[in-house]
Amino acid sequence: MCMIDHLDDIMDAGIDCIKIEGRAKSAYYAAIVTGAYRHVLDDVAAGREVDPVWRDEVEHVSHRHYSTGFYYGQPGQYYDNSRYIRDWQVCAVVTDCDADGNATLSLRNKFAAGDEIELVGPDSRPFTMTAPVMHDLEGFELYEPRTPQTVFKMKLPRYVPPMSFVRHAVSLGAKD
């Protein structure tokens, strides 16, 4: 279920508290979805036009086909495909970053220098960049860190707060 496109209706109905449904959601999932909903709720409450980037963000997490559940009647069962959609993957988590963008990260999934990646963090729109050559903690160049939890250094174009995510499109489509 996804109600991000209908938060105005929810607020008009007098509902002032919502929650994410589901079990065992990752920190990435919780951060992306709550951030997107928070931005849309703030826009709706302020009477501003909703920035479409926040709707797009909920497509960047692992999910099944989205629906509005029973909010607008009984839509019937969705039989076409119950597989998860996993078109984006977390590559790394920023653990530290200075004002110049010199960041320390912890690897989650492999990626390589030259890959197109996105950085997404609290209170900021995602931004796209090309992954630079990285360095291990001893200063040696890393072109493709592969071992999960590897700590490495990477130059970012600007400061990003700790717990920001590096992600990339995986072009794998829906998988079980």
Predicted regions and their residues:
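Surface-exposed amphipathic alpha-helical tracts and adjacent flexible/coil segments at the periphery
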Residues: M1-D176
